[in-house]
Amino acid sequence: MDTSSKENAHLFHKNSAQPAGGPSFKAGYPSTEEARPCCGKLKVFLGALSFVYFAKALTEGYLKSTITQIERRFDIPSSLVGIIDGSFEIGNLLVITFVSYFGAKLHRPKIIGAGCLVMGFGTMLIAVPQFFMEKYSYEKYERYSPSSNLTPNISPCYLESSSPSPRSIVGKSQNKINDECEVDTSSSMWVYVFLGNLLRGLGETPIQPLGIAYLDDFASEDNAAFYIGCVQTVAIIGPIFGFLLGSLCAKLYVDIGFVNLDHITITPKDPQWVGAWWLGYLIAGFLSLLAAVPFWCLPKTLPRSQSREDSGSSSEKSKFITDDPVNYQMAPREESMKIMEMARDFLPSLKSLFRNPVYILYLCASTVQFNSLFGMVTYKPKYIEQQYGQSSSKANFVIGLINIPAVALGIFSGGIVMKKFRLGICEATKLYLGSSVFGYLLFLSLFALGCENSSVAGLTVSYQGTKPVSYHERALFSDCNSRCKCSDSKWEPMCGDNGITYASACLAGCQSSSRSGKNIIFSNCTCVGFAAPKSGNWSGMMGRCQKDNGCSQMFLYFLVISVITSYTLSLGGIPGYILLLRCIQPQLKSFALGIYTLAVRVLAGIPAPVYFGVLIDTSCLKWGFKKCGSRGSCRLYDSHAFRHIYLGLTTLLGTVSVFLSTAVLLVLKKKYVSKRSSFITAREKIVMSSSVKKETCAARDHGLQPKYWPGKETRL
């Protein structure tokens, strides 16, 4: 070929790959030759989507790790904390349907980038109350503070002979309450946390439906499951860092940098300790803002893989976007016509989804299972703290370092299994169902791995320390502290030398106190001697008694079973997601994912933390009270009731989801069997028709003379 012909060929190739005016001779997406330089953009999108998944998952994990910190800082019950946690789902609910449906027809990467900006600002808004609230004030005797120049022999017990009359005490207390109520302006600052989490939910909305559908559209069928598995795995790595960040911040005092830490008398092991919960939200918000940058540089569409083009599977965008890529820049009139066309097709598309029995059953199964998982994950740190006596920092640390990696490994393993064995939709459903069955069977064993209640005088054991106390026998007053003028609303736990915790040193009947560093020692405690009369040491120390060594052993067993259960349940994550993508029409993919996300948010994400929190609150033994006398957060839980509510509700919901998943498999098998039988019947008819035609043609050709068909004697 000469030079001029080469130039003409090059010019023809250039013009055909990048048409200037007329329609391309290749319909649909850019040609393969043009696609090769741009194929790396799919990997860029994969990396950007993975990072934003990491950022949003880190924030979500950090939020779960600060549940107890927020509860104590704002002095609110678990049910209200559940509402704050569910505000994220409420934000999703407001826009998920429109974003998933209309967003699929617009510039998906830029919509995701805008969502990241909103999510980042919302995350930072959560931390704002810390800078406007008063300094954290935990329940304590002011004269026991190191800054109050404590002198020895001050009696926590106001003896009846030397104390003012009960009427004067009540009057002074009421006046103090009224004064504090006037200056307590931070009682409702939790609303900003609610609004920030709501805004975070709004920004997160387009990431999952648009991002996953974008990947599935432009990746090959073999790589789609693997790419989604990579994204989901990175999303699970996010909570690891979220919980570890929560563990680090929980060790720092809430007002660090604003107060003298030498004056703080409590430690991270104290039930009243509040860590620097606000610090992690500033870090997570910055990461979300940073994650928005790459999406503004990515194109609206990418070249499709050759396998997808050969298979003829239609993109979700092919229904409303023209085949010529040059025509993506539409005039305003054409753009408005497109939007009207999409709006008219909304209800038919919705009806098509709800007429799909596999989609509806899987939607119900996933919703019930996510109720189980949302409730379990939200209150898992609190469960570890209350059941096994661990600090908030340690609870977050073990979840982030042990549990979350098991979930990540399970999700990644599910993607590898799907890719390695090329599982079909029925096999994927079986793997999804099997992982759920074995996971919840393992979860049942956690019922046997509980600890006994802490020995708290008047609440879990009698003041004699010899027998448990029933619900009707609970009373913080006894003969041993009858001469003291104590408040039963205070929670200033003191650990006696007899191993029993008392609600306060006053209720323990202590008549003197002294300080050793930050520790406060109480002496001559009549109730301590009442439970151990033979012991000559009737003293105690500020703080709650630690649980016995047997509970530490149970905690190790709990971690082992919890890790195995987490891996088993997460193994079915990717197969279940592939089932969701393959049981619907390709052009409805983003819309179906949006409806799926909407249902999970509305029916699981919002209510699950709330009703889990309400039921957990019923196991509270000792409530705290705010300055104005209203009920605050729970100070002490009944370990047995907490365990049965937390584990029982999770198992019940998981069992229901297993039955619904079984129905999905049965309907799917029936649907495929009927389709296969109809396909075989149609194929047999075609084969029989072809054989008849061949015989007829052979008979006709046999009667023709060869001269009319020169060279065709052997035809047919």
UniProtKB/Swiss-Prot annotation:
Source taxonomy: Eukaryota, Metazoa, Chordata, Craniata, Vertebrata
Any one Pfam family match given in the protein's UniProt record, by short name: OATP
Biological processes per GO annotation: bile acid and bile salt transport; monoatomic ion transport; positive regulation of thyroid hormone generation; sodium-independent organic anion transport; thyroid hormone transport; transmembrane transport
Function, in words: Mediates the Na(+)-independent high affinity transport of thyroid hormones at the plasma membrane of brain capillary endothelial cells. The transport activity of substrates L-thyroxine (T4) and 3,3',5'-triiodo-L-thyronine (reverse T3, rT3) is much greater than that of 3,3',5-triiodo-L-thyronine (T3). The prehormone, T4, is the major form in the circulating blood and is converted to the active form, T3, by the iodothyronine-deiodinase in peripheral organs. T3 plays an essential role in brain development via binding to specific nuclear receptors (thyroid hormone receptor).
S-S pairs: 480-510, 486-506, 495-527
Coiled coil: none
PROSITE patterns cross-referenced by the UniProt entry: KAZAL_2, MFS
Subcellular location: Cell membrane
Catalytic activity, reaction form: 3,3',5'-triiodo-L-thyronine(out) = 3,3',5'-triiodo-L-thyronine(in); L-thyroxine(out) = L-thyroxine(in); L-thyroxine sulfate(out) = L-thyroxine sulfate(in); 17beta-estradiol 17-O-(beta-D-glucuronate)(out) = 17beta-estradiol 17-O-(beta-D-glucuronate)(in)
InterPro entries named in the record: Kazal_dom (IPR002350), Kazal_dom_sf (IPR036058), MFS_dom (IPR020846), MFS_trans_sf (IPR036259), OATP (IPR004156)
Gene Ontology CC annotations of this record: basolateral plasma membrane; plasma membrane
Topological domains annotated Extracellular: 64-82, 135-187, 257-274, 375-394, 447-558, 617-650
Kazal-like domain sequence ranges: 474-529
Name of this protein: Solute carrier organic anion transporter family member 1C1
Cytoplasmic side: 1-43, 104-109, 217-235, 300-352, 419-422, 582-590, 669-716
UniProt keyword Signal present: no
